[in-house]
């Protein structure tokens, strides 16, 4: 899940800790670039924080700790879910600004 906050609540941390095996953070520019790429490739526009969840498998594939943590057999049965909500609540003119920012960052 992409949390648009600096720190999740301690209550949430306690509730999900049995199910959590890792966490990461992304810079905003990464999420804006992903927003533009997803819009161009799939026609989906999500708010930037929703894109954070999509990058997890990329980080896992690059990290030797995670590579040793999950066997190829386990990975072949894995399902990665992204909590991709929020795009429909963003005003169209704001979403267009997000998209334009992502495109600009991709072209730098």
Q: Regions from the language model: what does each represent?
A:
Residues 7-75:
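Active-site-adjacent helical/loop segments in soluble small-molecule enzymes
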Residues 54-108:
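Phosphate-binding loop/pocket of nucleotide- and phosphate-handling active sites
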